[in-house]
């Protein structure tokens, strides 16, 4: 059923006598894949040439990584990196193919030609190409790119000023703008439905599990992960390894069993003591503080506020800052619909499925002011102001503040139950 396997079967590539052999390993290269058992970078440095013929990449850091390791590469004009390279008069070590929506056959032929040309180079020329690739990668060092970043940021501010000055209540939209405000008012004669969600409280002896579940420290510490899985391996997998959802699904009988399980309680106490010791360490007050902004953070699959590798990279920065005890504060966006789930149809076509996140099952909590009010921030946009509530996500010692522009939520305590009352605003503005 795999389209790559189908394309190879029956082609000259499947001929044992062919000089070209394909090793197709659709696996994450984490040194435990069962085929190579080496990390991506260990394999990368052993390559003669890498191919990244992207159909779309805002930047595409894989070919840049390749030349940083002095491995020549092939990319396309549909990758930001490819466009950046192609603007240079000379770029030895990087071949850039012109790719468009309808020229797949042309790109395939050009890709084959690029591989053939490289294979015909003598050893001296290959070594020259490798050195040139390494030198070219230095052009992308942050020390060089930061000046261009400042220019781009200044240009964005200038353009924002133009829009702010143009937009008024009776202003005519710019020709290139298509802004439509749709107001929806609730009818007073119709019933208003509100959602109620019940949160369970764990027995006192097991309360540390709740604290661990609400700090993502657990997701990169094997002892904490194993602790949750030990409780009920099948349920842990069914809850998609989300400890908050997992604890909500535990039966009262299982909780009582855990309260009497001395071996489990000893493991819980050990992990909790490790966590408290970790959290008690504070950064040096004299250390410069860092504010980190990103559109996405890949911290764990249960918190769907990322879509790819750059989000994972941003998430790793937060975890590393926590481990290094760097005083960093991160700011991002809380998406109701995170990354989509990919499925394949019977014909092999990719289908995207979007699932709404249940915020009550996420390791986030409202940020409140000294009066107990939910903290909100106002962001000035052309012709309007956007209000967003602030949530806090604890990533070890690092605080991640997530902005959420949806309706208001009110927490109500009734006995041992925590009820979350969600009230939608009576009037909304939609932009399409």
Give, region by region, the residue ranges found by the protein language model:
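Short glycine/serine-rich donor-binding loops of glycosyltransferases
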Residues: 60-63
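Aromatic "clamp/platform" in nucleotide-sugar-dependent glycosyltransferases that forms part
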Residues: 55
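Short hydrophobic beta-strand element within catalytic cores of glycosyltransferases
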Residues: 72-76, 82
């Amino acid at each position: 059923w795999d389209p790559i396997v189908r394309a190879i079967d029956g082609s000259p590539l499947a001929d044992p006598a062919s000089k070209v052999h394909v090793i197709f390993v659709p696996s994450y290269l984490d040194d435990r894949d069962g085929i190579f058992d080496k990390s991506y970078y260990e394999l990368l440095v052993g390559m003669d040439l890498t191919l990244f013929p992207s159909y779309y990449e805002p930047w595409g850091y894989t070919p840049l990584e390749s030349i940083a390791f002095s491995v020549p590469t092939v990319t396309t004009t549909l990758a930001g990196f490819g466009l950046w390279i192609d603007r240079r008069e000379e770029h030895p070590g990087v071949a850039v193919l012109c790719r468009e929506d309808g020229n797949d056959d042309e790109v395939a032929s050009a890709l084959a030609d690029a591989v053939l040309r490289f294979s015909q180079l003598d050893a001296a020329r290959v070594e020259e190409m490798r050195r040139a690739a390494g030198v070219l990668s230095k052009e992308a060092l942050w020390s060089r790119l930061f000046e261009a970043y400042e220019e781009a940021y200044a240009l964005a501010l200038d353009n924002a000023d133009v829009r702010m000055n143009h937009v008024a209540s009776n202003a005519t939209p710019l020709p290139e703008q298509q802004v439509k405000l749709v107001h929806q008012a609730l009818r007073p004669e119709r019933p208003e439905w509100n959602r109620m969600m019940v949160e369970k409280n764990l027995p006192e002896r097991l309360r540390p599990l709740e604290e661990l579940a609400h700090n993502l420290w657990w997701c990169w510490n094997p002892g904490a992960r194993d602790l949750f899985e030990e409780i009920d391996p099948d349920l842990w997998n069914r809850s998609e390894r989300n400890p908050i959802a997992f604890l909500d699904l535990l039966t009262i009988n299982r909780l009582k069993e855990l309260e009497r399980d001395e071996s489990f309680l000893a493991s819980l106490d050990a992990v909790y003591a490790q966590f408290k010791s970790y959290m008690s360490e504070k950064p040096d007050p004299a250390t410069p503080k860092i504010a980190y902004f990103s559109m996405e953070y890949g911290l764990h699959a249960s918190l769907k506020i990322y879509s790819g590798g750059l989000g994972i990279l941003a998430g790793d920065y937060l975890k590393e800052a926590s481990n290094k005890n760097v005083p960093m504060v991160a700011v991002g966006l809380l998406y109701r619909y995170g990354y989509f789930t990919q499925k394949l149809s019977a014909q092999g076509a990719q289908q995207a499925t979007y699932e709404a996140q249940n915020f009550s099952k996420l390791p986030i909590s409202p940020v409140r002011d000294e009066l107990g009010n939910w903290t909100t921030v106002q962001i000035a946009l052309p012709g309007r102001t956007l209000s967003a509530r602030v949530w806090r996500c604890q990533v070890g010692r690092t605080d991640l503040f997530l902005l959420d522009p949806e309706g208001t939520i009110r927490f109500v305590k009734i006995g041992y139950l925590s009820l979350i009352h969600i009230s939608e605003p009576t009037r909304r503005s939609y932009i399409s």
